Amino acid sequence: MNKEETDQYYIEETFKLALNGKFTAHPNPMVGAIVVKNGKVLGKGYHLRPGFPHAEQEAIKNAGKSVENSTLYVNLEPCYHFGRTPPCSNLIINSKIKRVVISCLDPNPLVNGKRDKQLKKSGIEVKVGVLKNQAMRLNRGFFSKFLLKRPNIICKSGISLDGKISLSNGISKWITSEESRLDVQTERALSPLIFSSSKTVMMDNPSLNIREPLLLKKILKQPDLGIVDRTLKIPLNSKVFKVSSRKIYLFTSIKKTTKKYKKNVIIVYIQSRKGKINLMECISFLAKQDINNIFVEAGP
């Protein structure tokens, strides 16, 4: 392989490593890193969850020996600022890494381009943009939050072969297969928040949670809920309120209520217009709560 092909190969490998954090890294991006010297992989790492070591730190640590004059591959620009963990820039510089290949810059204004410049000032060769589009797709929710000012949104819809989404008599009934329901469970696990409506909750009385045993072992917590309930008519004994370990945002146009909700229920006032709540105002609110991805499950 030539140098360009080699760079692409190892960046693709960082994508695979990054996926180890797909259920747990949120709200941080998924990041993988590899340290290579003379064609040999010295160390690999990935970011598992907030507060845990960053991928670059793990890769350098797992090398178990000097990484001087090596190349570090990482799918996202290394952090520059102090957060839950210290910035990786000093570690990379002090480790005397010779070259850093970055798939794409971090859209976070606290980071964007700053690490790139700092590394170059320290005499490290920096290459940016290898498989950039793939890297952005990998963390589409993270990029959406900073570039579009809203989370990435995925909508689920169960449709029969004749193009229907429910029975004509309004009775709730599964029209999806076991395989597709497992896909829904997986999408829920990948999303920090499920978005629905009062009509769906009242008609189907869903739990909107993760029940698949294998997925329960991988997630840190049940996804939060966002429900448009303009008049706060969802009964307090509904299944969605049974899981107390998650936040439930109720978007309503009612300023005060006598209903006694549990502490995990957050009432969010959104002024209605012509009897309807502006969904983009709900989405904007959720973006400010550090929600990168939203999975929409709502009927007609």
Indicate residue ranges for each PLM-predicted region.
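Short, basic/aromatic recognition patches
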Residues: 6-26, 145
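Zn2+-dependent cytidine deaminase-like catalytic core
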Residues: 35-134, 254
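Short, structured interface segments
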Residues: 129-146
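Short, small/polar residue-rich loop motifs at catalytic or cofactor-binding pockets
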Residues: 27-30, 152-153
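Short beta-strand scaffold segments in enzyme catalytic cores
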Residues: 30-39, 157-158
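Active-site ligand-binding patch in enzyme domains
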Residues: 144, 150, 154-293
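Amphipathic coiled-coil/heptad-repeat helices and related helical stalk/stem segments
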Residues: 7, 56, 84-88, 112, ...
